């Protein structure tokens, strides 16, 4: 019956059925064939949703939508440009810096690409950067969204396996910063080599102060999330609710851009995004129940450990496998299906679960800007094509130097535990 489970799942995916419903159809087919009472389907479906931690997903999504409604993308980019726009390749740095701050609000990569890309790409093109490079740095920097907290994929990974969401958030900070610094270094080298422009002089103090004043409301939200969770003052779910109240206050009373029409748009987008994730979680929990019942995770773990018991080689194999999976499968779906199984392998060779969670998230998130199914790359390319010649192959060529740096940081995080779990333990004890 295990063969039926996987055949139905793969066939459903192949004919275009959404991942969540493919998992559900495969689970139903297995249960009917194995004569398992369907009440088990309902029980495990709702058990997957019965989590206080999962409430922070609609919370952070709604808070990000509220802030974005106030035009936060323009304000963040202007703030970043005021700080670094005067150096060679300054606007490329500003692109990365804005994504790092926006990551602390949205928690997703695609929202970063769409919200910031519509502002960043035309601004870079107008200042003399070529379109493919503008697209590449926008797509690559948007991958910081699910790595710098809050992170929806991290919430999923932690919830599925009973790990601490707060600790995983803290473990993602240093890898996110390293990715940002690596991208900035790459931008500098390419900017010097290609003679990309820079602003003639530093922004005036008045301009910097004005840009900071405009962006301060977004920076405060990031501080609420990081320091509230890091200090043990609030849980991630409580932090998300505080951010919703704060975001609503800023959108209505500070930015003054929130009317009934805008509120409806924010609520609609939040419900659409959150419900899709929740459906995936619920169906994946039923699928995971079947895999556990058939001892699939332990069989995979035993097979890999028979191949080699070397921790470093196991991590290398898992990295290569996840990079491949990330090129084809949506991040959250891959985490829900694969993470519990691979975690059993990793812990068997002595890898810390929190460190492994960051490794898995980074691998799959980097797939968002790699072909053939890199949604962030597609979105950024579509935006860039409005402002000049830019095909998908052009974007991929421009992306290669950034991907080399990103994968370099990934392997550094894989083999230096202090960068993840070490920092988390220092901060949270």
Where are these regions (language model features)?
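Alpha-helical transmembrane segments of multi-pass membrane transport proteins
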Residues: 1-429
């Amino acid at each position: 019956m295990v063969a039926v489970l996987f055949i139905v799942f793969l066939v459903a995916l192949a004919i275009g059925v959404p991942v969540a419903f493919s998992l559900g159809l495969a689970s139903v087919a297995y249960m009917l064939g194995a004569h398992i009472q369907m009440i088990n389907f309902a029980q495990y479906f709702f058990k997957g949703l019965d989590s206080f931690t999962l409430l922070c997903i609609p919370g952070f999504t709604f808070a990000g939508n509220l802030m974005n409604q106030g035009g936060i993308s323009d304000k963040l980019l202007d703030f970043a440009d005021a700080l670094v726009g005067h150096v060679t390749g300054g606007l490329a740095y500003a692109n990365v810096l804005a994504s790092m701050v926006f990551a602390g609000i949205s928690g997703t990569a695609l929202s970063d690409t769409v919200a910031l890309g519509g502002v960043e790409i035309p601004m870079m093109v107008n200042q003399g950067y070529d379109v493919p490079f503008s697209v590449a740095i926008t797509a690559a920097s948007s991958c910081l969204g699910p790595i710098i907290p809050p992170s929806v994929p991290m919430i999923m990974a932690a919830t599925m396996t009973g790990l601490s969401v707060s600790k995983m958030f803290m473990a993602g900070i240093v890898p996110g910063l390293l990715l940002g610094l690596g991208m900035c270094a790459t931008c500098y080298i390419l900017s010097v080599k290609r003679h990309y422009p820079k602003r003639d002089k530093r922004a005036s103090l008045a301009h910097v102060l004005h840009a900071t004043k405009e962006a301060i409301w977004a920076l405060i939200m990031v501080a609420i999330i990081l320091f509230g969770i890091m200090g043990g003052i609030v849980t991630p779910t409580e932090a998300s609710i505080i951010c919703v109240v704060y975001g609503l206050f800023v959108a209505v009373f500070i930015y003054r851009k929130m009317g009934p029409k805008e509120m409806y748009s924010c609520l609609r987008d939040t419900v659409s995004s959150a419900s899709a994730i929740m459906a995936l979680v619920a169906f994946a929990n039923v699928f995971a129940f079947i895999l556990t019942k058939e001892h699939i995770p332990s069989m995979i773990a035993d097979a890999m450990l028979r191949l080699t018991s070397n921790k470093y080689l196991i991590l290398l194999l898992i990295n290569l496998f996840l990079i491949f999976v990330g090129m084809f499968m949506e991040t959250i779906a891959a985490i829900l299906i694969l993470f519990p199984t691979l975690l059993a392998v990793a812990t068997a060779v002595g890898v810390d679960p929190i460190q492994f969670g960051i490794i898995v998230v980074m691998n799959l998130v980097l797939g968002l800007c790699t072909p053939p199914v890199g949604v962030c790359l597609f979105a950024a390319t579509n935006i860039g094509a409005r402002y000049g010649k830019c095909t998908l192959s052009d974007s991929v060529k421009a992306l290669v130097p950034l991907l080399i740096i990103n994968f370099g940081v990934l392997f550094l995080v894989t083999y230096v535990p202090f960068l993840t779990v070490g920092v988390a333990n220092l901060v949270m004890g």
